[in-house]
């Protein structure tokens, strides 16, 4: 087969799905996986069959694609702004159970205005647990919740957070951040109860923090995504081992212009340029070449991967497999996944960032 291409080990995917579902089930917590990690209908349906309560998406476009593939309970973990998006949200909410993230009263009011002739739209308040991206500060959540309760056509279901700063942490800090993430939203729930505001969902989520989130009483849902794959960043964080990484990039050595340097046919358009999302670099190079630990993918052009090494190296024409740094980005750059060299899975929601 021609390279570069993405290879999937189905057995590892199935094991990763089962282990995360077992973790959630054992704590009587719902698992609502984030499908932005794979954007693939086959994997989504494997997750739902294993027991997931629904799915999480980053964008409305992903929600539309996944609904066509069978998803019925969808959380859009992103603020929806603009008339065109609201038109699409109303249409989707007529055929699926949709919940939307909010962190702003004005945005929520404009969204609710579109649901006068339908059932109310469910919302979760996003709480900032340290990422400093979207989300209200914890001590502002009560005021927003009280305001949302006065908005017609809106149903406040709960609160959620994402401690994405964990990707800039050292492995030793992952547990601490996971507990902090969970305690933050549980504390918000407790504060709401003092005002007789009862919510059903207290949601946290990331692959590194999931197993620590479930240690905190009061969390009702986790939303990891990358766990289906795992990748070099997860390995660098100490969250996974290379043997738990289900996605690899197959590439071919196409040049060896001088001693200590070779070139592969996978560049930034395949491997991405991610070396750690939120600060600390926990990876070396642009992926791990399996079986060749002394090789470093030092730099990328669009179609070239420049590899440096000391000692032995693969020859021109030889194929190598690479565990990417960030699997979610790599999948979004591809059209297809080759599964155990027997099946072809489409990346159905590729490019659906709309």
Task: Locate predicted features.
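N-terminal glycine-rich anion-binding loops that anchor highly charged ligand groups
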Residues: 12-43, 56-58
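Active-site-proximal beta-alpha core segment in soluble small-molecule metabolic enzymes
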Residues: 34-167
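C-terminal accessory subdomain/extension
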Residues: 260-354
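Flexible, glycine/charged-enriched surface loops at secondary-structure junctions
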Residues: 29-30, 192-201, 316, 332-334
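Active-site loop/helix belt of alpha/beta enzymes
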Residues: 121, 128-241
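Active-site loop ensemble at the mouth of alpha/beta enzyme cores that anchors a bound cofactor
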Residues: 209-288
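Generic N-terminal amphipathic, Lys/Arg-enriched alpha-helix
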Residues: 1-8
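Conserved, mostly hydrophobic/aromatic
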Residues: 13, 36, 66, 125, ...
């Amino acid at each position: 087969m021609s390279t570069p291409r993405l290879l999937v080990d189905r057995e590892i995917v199935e094991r990763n799905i089962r282990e995360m579902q077992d973790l959630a089930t054992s704590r009587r917590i719902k698992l609502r996986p984030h499908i932005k990690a794979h954007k693939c209908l086959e994997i989504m349906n494997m997750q739902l069959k294993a027991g997931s309560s629904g799915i999480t998406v980053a964008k409305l476009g992903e929600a539309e694609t996944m609904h066509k593939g069978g998803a019925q309970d969808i959380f859009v973990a992103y603020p929806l702004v603009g008339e065109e998006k609201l038109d699409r949200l109303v249409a989707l909410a007529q055929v699926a159970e949709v919940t939307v993230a909010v962190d702003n009263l004005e945005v929520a009011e404009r969204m609710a205005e579109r649901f006068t002739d339908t059932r109310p739209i469910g919302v979760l308040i996003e709480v900032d647990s340290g990422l400093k991206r979207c989300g209200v500060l914890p001590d502002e959540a009560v005021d927003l919740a009280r305001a949302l309760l006065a908005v017609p056509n809106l149903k406040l279901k709960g609160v959620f957070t994402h401690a994405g700063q964990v990707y800039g942490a050292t492995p030793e800090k992952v547990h601490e951040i996971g507990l902090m993430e969970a305690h933050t939203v549980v504390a918000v729930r407790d504060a709401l109860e003092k005002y007789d505001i009862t919510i059903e969902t207290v949601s946290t989520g990331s692959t590194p923090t999931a197993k620590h989130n479930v240690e905190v009483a009061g969390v009702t849902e986790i939303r990891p995504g990358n766990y289906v794959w795992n990748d070099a960043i997860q390995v660098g964080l100490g969250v996974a081992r290379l043997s738990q990484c289900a996605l690899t990039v197959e590439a071919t050595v196409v040049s060896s212009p001088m001693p200590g340097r070779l070139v592969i046919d996978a560049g930034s358009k395949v491997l991405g340029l991610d070396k750690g999302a939120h600060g600390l670099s926990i990876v070396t190079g642009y992926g791990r070449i399996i079986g060749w630990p002394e090789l470093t993918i030092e730099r990328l052009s669009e179609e070239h991967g420049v590899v440096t090494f000391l000692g032995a190296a693969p020859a021109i024409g030889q194929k190598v497999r690479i565990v990417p740094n960030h699997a979610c980005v790599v999948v979004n750059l591809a059209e297809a996944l080759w599964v155990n060299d027997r099946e072809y899975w489409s990346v159905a929601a590729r490019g659906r960032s709309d």
